[in-house]
């Protein structure tokens, strides 16, 4: 078994909507990023890569490479996870915490779970996505951006 932790943050800017967990969410602003700015999938990608000591999303998909400009983070997650599966690992469980003052995430978390489970080839019951605020404190509380943390347990498949 291997445990990984991922963290990502993006600043609000430009026009909405935003994409979080592969879900398009209406909002007055977008998230500034080289790719689509999906903080959930970026944190998840970092967690799975970190669990198997394969670096992070920025190493695998550098923001200096124009090929990833505006990239769909679901595509990036699938590519990263294919490398993790090639090492013989599968998802045990994944726990995601979105830290955002706005917009409200609860209506969207069920679809986020479905998207992530599909991308990671696991059951939706292995995926948890929840959201919290910072009680109006800090950059998140001032609605300047969104952050996300992810913790994953990977299980090595037996070669029987």
UniProtKB/Swiss-Prot annotation:
Name the residues that bind a divalent metal cation. Answer: 8, 10, 42
The UniProt keyword set, sorted, is: Isoprene biosynthesis, Lyase, Metal-binding
Annotated catalysed reactions: 4-CDP-2-C-methyl-D-erythritol 2-phosphate = 2-C-methyl-D-erythritol 2,4-cyclic diphosphate + CMP
* Protein name stated in the entry: 2-C-methyl-D-erythritol 2,4-cyclodiphosphate synthase
Show which residues form the site (Transition state stabilizer): 34, 133
The cofactors it requires, by name, are:
a divalent metal cation
Q: What is its EC number?
A: 4.6.1.12
Q: What does this protein do?
A: Involved in the biosynthesis of isopentenyl diphosphate (IPP) and dimethylallyl diphosphate (DMAPP), two major building blocks of isoprenoid compounds. Catalyzes the conversion of 4-diphosphocytidyl-2-C-methyl-D-erythritol 2-phosphate (CDP-ME2P) to 2-C-methyl-D-erythritol 2,4-cyclodiphosphate (ME-CPP) with a corresponding release of cytidine 5-monophosphate (CMP).
Gene Ontology biological-process entries: isopentenyl diphosphate biosynthetic process, methylerythritol 4-phosphate pathway; terpenoid biosynthetic process
- The primary gene name is ispF
Query: Which pathway does it serve?
Result: Isoprenoid biosynthesis; isopentenyl diphosphate biosynthesis via DXP pathway; isopentenyl diphosphate from 1-deoxy-D-xylulose 5-phosphate: step 4/6
Q: Give me the residues that bind 4-CDP-2-C-methyl-D-erythritol 2-phosphate, please.
A: 8-10, 34-35, 56-58, 61-65, 100-106, 132-135, 139, 142
Protein family according to the UniProt entry: Belongs to the IspF family.
Q: How, per the record, is the cofactor bound?
A: Binds 1 divalent metal cation per subunit.
| GO molecular function, a single term | 2-C-methyl-D-erythritol 2,4-cyclodiphosphate synthase activity
Query: Sorted alphabetically, which PROSITE patterns does this protein's record hold?
Result: ISPF
Query: How does this chain assemble?
Result: Homotrimer.
